[in-house]
Amino acid sequence: MASSGNGTTAGTGSPCGACKFLRRKCASDCIFAPYFSSEQGAARFAAIHKVFGASNVSKLLLNVPIHDRCEAVVTIAYEAQARLHDPVYGCVSHIFALQQQVAFLQSQVMQMKAQIAGHQTSAAGDLRHSSESTNQFMTWQQTSVSPIGSAYSTPYNHHQPYYGHVNPNNPVSPQSSLEESFSNTSSDVTTTANVRETHHQTGGGVYGHDGIGFHEGYPNKKRSVSYCSSDLGELQALALRMMKN
């Protein structure tokens, strides 16, 4: 696109593309020579001339600083091509299409941000629910007690002795409990001895003549029962004396 100072393309002596299209002699100070080459400038300048006119473009470039004229020529050529492609909107149609694309992309960005926020909120809610469930489970473990363990860990069982079935309206002392125990034992032994003696006299066992029980041939049974009763009486008397002391 560069041309020599005399208005002709360097090394060829041909006019610039604009002058070639206009079929005129290219002057040394041609304003179009630096921007329209002799080979490809004619077709490019044709669209500009058809839309804006050569004289109008020349006046426009004269009002633009030299260091900005190249960019001005590029934009003028773009506007001319857009106007030929779309006589109604020209380059505005391209601008409108780009604006629609920007708006569509912005809406997609907003949707993605909303989805991300929703996922973050859901994740935070799940984490909070999991934490609350864990805390409730740990609290339940700390406060819950096994029924068997509680039955054997009460203060009463640790510190209170067991005296059998005690009536709260009639408390029993250890001495009276021991006396009752010896009395029950003595009465049981006496009852057993009487039963054995009765069946021994009748000639049969505990369950009759043919049953299983204490049969004849054991004359020392009554004697051993008497010894046992006397021993229990002595033990009972000794225990009572020890408790009184």
UniProtKB/Swiss-Prot annotation:
Pfam families: LOB. It comes from the Eukaryota. It is found in: Nucleus. Coiled coil: none annotated. Induction: By auxin. Keywords: Nucleus. Residues 14-116 form the LOB domain. One of its GO terms (cellular component) is nucleus. GO terms for biological process: callus formation; lateral root formation; positive regulation of DNA-templated transcription. InterPro entries: LOB. Homodimer and heterodimer with LBD18. Belongs to the LOB domain-containing protein family. This is LOB domain-containing protein 16. The lineage of its organism: Eukaryota, Viridiplantae, Streptophyta, Embryophyta, Tracheophyta.
